[in-house]
């Protein structure tokens, strides 16, 4: 309905105008978050080898496709349906529009607007895992995981945090999803990569890590720029209202990302003798992930400090998983989303006067516990049934040919 229709229906003109502005802003935010799929696709494709590019693109596409369908049918009801003991939603399955009030609103917005905004968030959490399991995962196995996270992993912890569940009642604060979106995806990435095992050639006989360079830093850089741009929709859009604090949220988001980028650049320059390109790009994302939980409540200088911490932490985290834990993560998603999502959520309790460190720690650790257990169950079942990993021949030849019968660069010959 337009403004005149709302007024004719008895709504105050000011309230009607505010509602329409909120609708427009939330839809803008949702479209920006949707376009993050393109950013993730470019990052993952650029940081991996050319022979697997088509597979990367297909996985990112299917994360959104499956997320849209399964979150609509099951996930939204679990996340935002009528609360049952603070643990899970129990109403709205198969038709989430039944959760709307008599005016068709849910949480102050038309139900469709609220639903699409959380749908794109669900797809974002799912797609984080793609890069960590890249270059050796069966396509069917990945589709099964993507459906699982959209149905009963992301929505359950999402209910705890955003759906009126026990963490929300306790006062846990995760404004735009450092925990609910990014850490959930990062934990799933950790479990998936661990069970899957490293790529062929990643470690020598002595267990020393070898670099497997991505094929296109230009594409990876484009992905980072897209993600940084879309993150303004991710964080600012989480107000689901055209409010005056949008500028503050945008500023803390940008400052944290900038500080993290600079911190990563300096650390890699010191440790490696030269500023590392791919690690610096991941530093940008680390800062964005870390600030997402508290972008609405911390000061500008606190945002800079959070960014600096994330930018430094991501370097050592990537090195730890690569060299100590021996978990092969081609794009660094475990560190960027899992570790920095965890850290950013904790730091809300340090830098925000409104929220306590104790509550933030409880919220983060409880989410880790649930997601870790469910991810282990899901990936183990998939591995024991259809199998997680492709054959040695398929991995060496590339997944594009064996999984999809095509090549992303059919007319080009690559030479290093």
Task: List where the protein language model places each region.
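Hydrophobic alpha-helical transmembrane bundles of multi-pass membrane proteins
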Residues: 2-416
